Design a protein with these regions (language model features):
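Asparagine-centered strand-capping/turn motif at beta-strand->loop junctions
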Residues: 100-101
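Short, conserved beta-strand element in jelly-roll/cupin
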Residues: 46-49, 57-73, 112-113
């Protein structure tokens, strides 16, 4: 399974997160795969030193795929870490969060900007937050059924 953390701005004005995975279905050659879904644009970014951004929201609804490096995120809910291979599904465009690099390795990542209607095949595994958005249930259903991506 591919680890995925969902980060969002809640109706309470705070940032929240939950642990999960990318919903995958059996595919050819014993592979597991998700349905295809549209993205608006893709870019790469590398951060060598801790930028000390402080609390900030994300500029868009997006997937952030960590290629190398490790970091710790802080939200109003608590903290979580990302490592190479992890995916951050972020919809935190209002409340904000902070992050710090862990170790000496730069954080290399791919940003995949999503449309507002794009359903991401996120499946929660251990909800961290008691606050859940209605959209997460719709996305969870799509991930389970393989529909709507």
């Amino acid at each position: 399974m591919i680890r995925c953390i969902r980060l969002w701005s809640g109706p309470d004005g705070n940032s929240h997160f939950e642990e999960g995975v990318v919903g995958l279905q059996p595919g050819p050659r014993s592979d597991m795969l998700s349905n295809k879904f549209p993205i608006t644009s893709v870019s790469f970014q590398e951060t060598d030193a801790d930028p000390k951004l402080g609390w900030h929201p994300d500029p868009a609804r997006q997937l952030v795929i960590t290629l190398s490096g490790a970091l710790e995120f802080t939200t109003h809910d608590g903290r979580f870490s990302l490592r190479a291979g992890d995916i951050l599904f972020t919809e935190d465009t209002v409340a904000g969060h902070d992050w710090n690099l862990l170790g000496e390795q730069p954080w290399r990542r791919l940003y995949a900007i999503l449309g507002q209607a794009t359903l991401v095949p996120f499946r929660p595994t251990a909800p961290h937050s008691a606050v859940a958005r209605p959209e997460s249930r719709k996305a969870e259903t799509a991930a389970k059924t393989g529909a709507g991506l």
